[in-house]
């Protein structure tokens, strides 16, 4: 549980497993390098059953699994012995702060009593604050960045793929005449993600698709998936109200030179966004403990929700593959019927007039099947290019929020409680020194400086803790807007089915009408 108000948050619990334990059921297998493998994503441990269906043979699950593995293992987020895991976030409540610690801004300490705040969660001020954040984010906005794969691969020994990245609208804080097309490679996208994680660790930074899965880095289907994943990544970044304003994001999208060379020469800022910031006391007055409870509940259920949506997306992909097979089989059926009609004349030489009439209608059936195959092909393409992308984008959004929660557990710690205790002890020593004439002045001054330094550190850490709290609330508020992605994707799904179902029905009605004249007897 991500309890921001708990004094024992950082005690080790079952959720903070080491990589070996957390990924015990996510072992690489030879099937990982093929597109026929079991779901072994971090939340879909084994081949999962869904009613009478077993969710196996899914390259999407491999993509999600590798993405999450990169997120947690390669970044070593669960590195044993991380000091922050044993620290508290908010320190002791005000009742435990020594009143003699002058100069400490205790107004930023966690408030034990909420009597001075609004009793109801959705107070008018808090609601206005949230509404102002909601208006900055529209997850249903159209993509404004296009990523296309350049066919020619570069490199002498190790070939790599380049991508043409084009933004379709004028970007914030850029000249309208800025270059709208740049060439980037996967490592450039990776660099952008890493600097965003350094600067904005408590923002919803989307994950990148895996660089490769087994030996699939040269597989055209895998490369197509990776290109789509990169496109989703950069569009989620540019939709984010804070990330889209970042200078390095704009550099990534506008600087026409090789980004690797630019990084070696340029001096760019990667300091955390909270540097030199002070928490607005108006926000502190808005805070309500129930907000922490909501986060904790979301954190407890996010894996379940992610698992369910992955299953949904897998089934959508499976439906797409079935449509491809249906389309091919309809064309095949049309050809087989044509062959039958060509050969049937030899079986009915005495009834040539009738059999020719029948065969002409059979030709109509063949054309109808080809028309249905074209309809199935269009539907499959629409699923692949639009619907499936929307399902996967929502996966990316959920994983981005999960990343915020997980990074909070690792990176938001402080040692306020330890510093408070040390200040109290040193204050007692200082008082005893004042009554002892034998104590040297240098020792007294040194202890007083230590107390003052610890007080400043406590104030700084309290300030940072509140800034983190505000940042995560902003992210959680704008995340609420993504609930409409669920509505949108299912509306689009139903609309698509109605469209192609109507086309299919009309086609069958036409062929049925034509077949009414097909001979049933000699009369």
Curated annotation (Swiss-Prot):
One Pfam family linked to the record: PX
Positions annotated to bind a 1,2-diacyl-sn-glycero-3-phospho-(1D-myo-inositol-3-phosphate): 185, 187, 211, 226
Localization terms from the record: Cytoplasm; Membrane
Residue intervals of the PX domain: 141-260
Membrane topology value: Peripheral membrane protein
Domain-related comment: The PX domain binds phosphatidylinositol 3-phosphate which is necessary for peripheral membrane localization.
InterPro entries assigned: AH/BAR_dom_sf, PX_dom, PX_dom_sf, SNX8/Mvp1, SNX8/Mvp1_PX, Snx8_BAR_dom
UniProt key word Cytoplasm: yes
A Gene Ontology cellular-component term: cytosol
GO biological process, one term: plasma membrane tubulation
Keywords in alphabetical order: Cytoplasm, Membrane, Protein transport, Transport
Positions with biased composition (Polar residues): 17-37
Primary gene name: MVP1
SMART domains, A to Z: PX
SUPFAM superfamilies per UniProt: PX domain
CDD domains referenced in this protein's UniProt entry, alphabetically: BAR_SNX8, PX_SNX8_Mvp1p_like
UniProt key word Oxidoreductase: no
Residues covered by region (Disordered): 1-37
Record-level Gene Ontology MF annotations: identical protein binding; phosphatidylinositol-3-phosphate binding
Annotated family: Belongs to the sorting nexin family.
Protein name: Sorting nexin MVP1
Function: Required for vacuolar protein sorting.
Gene3D superfamilies in alphabetical order: Arfaptin homology (AH) domain/BAR domain, Phox-like domain
